[in-house]
Regions:
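Active-site beta-loop-alpha junctions enriched in small/polar residues
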Residues: 72, 99-100, 123-127, 156-159, ...
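Active-site gating/metal-coordination segments in enzymes
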Residues: 46, 52-59, 100-194
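Catalytic pocket-lining loop regions of alpha/beta-barrel enzymes
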Residues: 43, 47, 169-302
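N-terminal carbohydrate-binding/catalytic regions of secreted carbohydrate-active enzymes
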Residues: 69-113
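Mid-to-C-terminal alpha-helical segments outside catalytic/metal-binding sites
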Residues: 7, 21, 40-65, 80-84, ...
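Bacterial N-terminal signal peptides
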Residues: 27-36
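Hydrophobic faces of well-ordered beta-strands that scaffold small-molecule active sites
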Residues: 67-71, 94-96, 118-123, 152-154, ...
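Alpha-helical scaffolding within the catalytic cores
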Residues: 50-54, 77-81, 101-110, 135-141, ...
């Protein structure tokens, strides 16, 4: 009798039990092999505890932790390089949104490998499948969000101008059928999503209709504090339009412009980062922007907007947020913008000091 059978005999005491135990073992292992990898991932409540522990670890070190809600993962940057940058910049957690090629599952895989660094985030809506309203893409997104495995959705593009790393000049109306799927999913599940929409005056109404029609959707409008074309973006020349929207729509949030202070948008030649006051004396947070951050401290978060092509900007982006934005507001406001607001959006819970 082999070791396996002798062991079972030893445990069971009777030969008749050997057969049954062998069948049970074979069945159990067979069942495990049939399960998807993430079926054995930790429960959501346990994952939240892991995230919380990491944030408290950074706090204990004397650094204000940051939760980065907008990272574009393309699979070309070695994950350990990203983690090193996160550590060097006090970024506790990253909402790791994959591109269409990798799919949402990739974020779960990386969370499984590094559960205290990466927040499971669905695919970004910035590729051909999204812009063609691909049914399979939308069905997969729906399945993913409803699975309960993801804490956030990626960034979905509406109007998008060509940028420093791509030439996409596209417009998926915010009130299109594809966006209705995203808004509905957020309304049903409470899972937040990011929206890229150039703030042209004539394009604001399509967004406002959706914010009004889906009051339970959690919408993070990306890159506030930016104006790429003051001719078309007349309302967004100052923070007043932002203040008006925040008052009207309690389900609207913003992440902050990531552009280098003083840099010009290549499409128009205008300085786009209106969040900052730039002078010969240096760079500071604009006075009116400071007022709006302190008036609505619960409505702003930090997103790096880093992708493969902009990876070397990571340190500069985080340093700008820390030295200009977070140091430019009250301590309690800085804490909310840095991590507490993102924490509530992803966990559904207030941060406990």
């Amino acid at each position: 009798m082999g070791f396996y059978n002798r062991l079972i005999c030893f445990m069971s005491g009777t030969k008749g039990s050997i057969y049954m135990l062998k069948r049970m073992v074979i069945f159990t292992f067979g069942l495990i092999l049939l399960l998807p990898i993430n079926a054995v991932s930790i429960e959501r409540s346990e994952q939240i505890k892991v995230f919380e522990k990491k944030i408290r670890q950074v706090l204990k070190s004397g650094i204000l932790p940051i939760i980065d809600v907008e990272y574009h993962h393309g699979g070309k940057i070695e994950i350990k390089r990203l983690i090193k940058r996160m550590d060097e910049n006090g970024v506790a957690l990253t909402w790791l949104g994959p591109n269409e090629k990798l799919g949402s599952e990739n974020s779960l895989t990386l969370n499984g490998l590094y559960p205290d660094r990466f927040v499971p985030t669905t695919v970004h809506g910035d590729g051909k499948l999204w812009h063609n309203s691909d049914k399979r893409f939308l069905d997969e997104l729906t399945k993913d969000v409803r699975s309960g495995k993801y804490f956030a959705m990626g960034e979905f593009e509406a109007r998008h101008y060509p940028s420093s790393t791509n030439d996409r000049d596209v417009h998926m109306p915010v009130d299109s059928e594809a966006f209705q799927v995203v808004f509905q999913l957020s309304s049903e599940t409470g899972v937040p999503f990011l929206l890229h929409h150039e703030a042209e005056d004539q394009l604001l109404s399509e967004l406002e209709r959706m914010l009004a029609n889906y009051p339970k959707a959690k919408v993070i409008w990306c890159h506030v504090g930016r104006n790429r074309d003051p001719v078309k973006w007349k309302k967004f020349r100052t923070p007043d339009a932002v203040r008006e929207l925040l008052k009207k729509y309690p389900n609207l949030y913003f992440d902050l412009v990531q552009s280098k202070p003083g840099s010009k948008y290549r499409g128009t030649g205008y300085v786009e980062g209106i969040l900052y006051d730039v002078s010969s004396w240096g760079v500071s947070l604009g006075t009116e922007w400071k007022k709006i951050f302190e008036e609505f401290p619960d409505r702003f978060v930090i997103g790096s907007d880093i992708n493969t092509g902009r990876f070397e900007n990571y340190d500069r982006v985080m340093e700008t947020f820390r030295t200009i934005v977070l140091k430019g507001v009250r301590k309690d406001v800085a804490e909310k913008i840095a991590f507490k607001n993102a924490w509530k959006l992803m966990s559904g819970e207030d941060w406990r000091d």
